[in-house]
Design a protein with these regions (language model features):
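Alpha-helical elements of the RecA-like P-loop NTPase motor core of helicases
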Residues: 87, 119, 152
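Conserved class I S-adenosyl-L-methionine
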Residues: 102-120, 140-142
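Conserved SAM-binding loop of SAM-dependent methyltransferases across substrates and taxa
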Residues: 114-134
């Protein structure tokens, strides 16, 4: 795909398709991003132009649609990213739930990506429980994402050294992870309160239920 230029009309059609179908909004003049993200995918699919890709997508090729969304989804994430939201979760939200004697609180990570955010949330809950005599012991976290590739990574809960080095303290690594095959896996006590679901936020979300706290930091 790098062998040709994307026309303005082709880019606009692809831009509109992504926004309408899954809520991904590309900025203006991001042809280079489309080229870099889709190059290998289109080569393997024997697609040589963006117009050809759109023909396939409009024809209802669901496998190709999933692959395109996976390729175009931004997956930059880290453990306890920006710190403050997790401090607020710990010191404000969980304290409030504890004061109201809520043991079955529900949380939602609306775009969980490869799992770092949702497992960070679960670690905070686990640590809070250890300080508060098992308060919130029946709490659950729903983790959703539009990318099946990212959901599979998150479900596995297995991360390499380089991934663990992004925002995870040595103490939390020791407490919440265990060696697994060629990497490290989140321990069951943290994994067990999390359930995963593929979800397009452009579609109906009322059926997901009500939540005491929603993290949607990876959505924007």
């Amino acid at each position: 795909m790098s062998d040709f230029n994307i026309t303005v009309a082709e880019y606009q059609e692809f831009h509109d398709y992504l926004e309408e179908s899954c809520g991904i909004v590309l900025g203006p003049n991001r042809q280079y991003l489309v080229t870099s993200r889709l190059h290998m995918l289109l080569r393997h699919a024997a697609i040589d132009t963006l117009s050809h890709l759109m023909e396939r997508l409009r024809s209802g090729d669901s496998r190709l649609r999933i692959d395109v969304i996976d390729a175009m989804t931004t997956n930059e994430t880290s453990w306890f990213r920006d710190t403050v939201p997790f401090e607020v979760l710990d010191r404000v939200i969980l304290e409030d739930l504890y004061a109201r004697k809520v043991n079955d609180a529900t949380f939602w990570s609306a775009a969980c990506s490869s799992g770092q955010e949702v497992y960070s949330m679960s670690m905070v809950i686990e640590e809070f429980m250890s300080r508060r005599a098992m308060a919130l012991r029946n709490s659950t976290i729903l983790a959703t994402d539009i990318s099946t590739k990212m959901l599979n990574q998150a479900r596995s809960a297995v991360y390499g050294e380089a991934q663990l080095d992004r925002g995870l303290s040595a103490k939390r690594r020791t407490v919440h992870f265990e060696p697994f095959e060629s990497g490290f896996r989140v321990k069951d006590k943290v994994r067990s309160r999390v359930r995963f679901k593929e979800q397009n936020l452009q579609q109906e979300i009322a059926t997901l239920g009500k939540f005491d706290c929603i993290f949607c930091r990876n959505v924007l």
